Regions:
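Acidic, surface-exposed loops and disordered segments
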Residues: 1-118
């Protein structure tokens, strides 16, 4: 499986690997698969388990390795495991985390329209 994702180390070092597979059907299956993946990762985080979603670089090889038959297809590979060092998400601001990940700052891609009142 590691040879079929963009970051093989995230799979090789994982204690558990989950491959989310979808079947065509009604609704937004890719959207639902993303929500399922996010739910698994958030549940793991709540229990002290880290995770890393991986994009699939060779879908055909992954399908062969796992005997996934069309029309089913894998959409994401998630590695789960124990943190390699203590977690401290508050050691950086959201802006610092975004910069470290080489992502655009939120204020450059988010537009706030009006005020939200609760």
């Amino acid at each position: 499986i590691a040879d079929t994702v963009y970051r093989p180390g995230n799979v090789l070092d994982a204690g558990l690997v989950v491959v989310v597979v979808v079947s065509p059907g009604g609704g937004l299956v890719d959207f639902d698969a993303g929500r399922a993946a996010q739910s698994m990762m958030l549940a793991g985080w709540a229990e002290g388990i880290t995770s890393c979603p991986n994009g699939i670089s060779d879908a055909d090889a992954l399908a062969r390795a796992l005997a996934i038959e069309p029309p089913e297809r894998a959409v994401v590979v998630i590695g789960f495991g124990a943190p390699s060092k203590p977690r401290d998400p508050e050691r950086r601001t959201p802006e610092e985390w975004s910069a470290r990940a080489k992502r655009l700052p939120l204020d450059s891609i988010v537009t706030h329209v009006g005020a939200v009142h609760g």
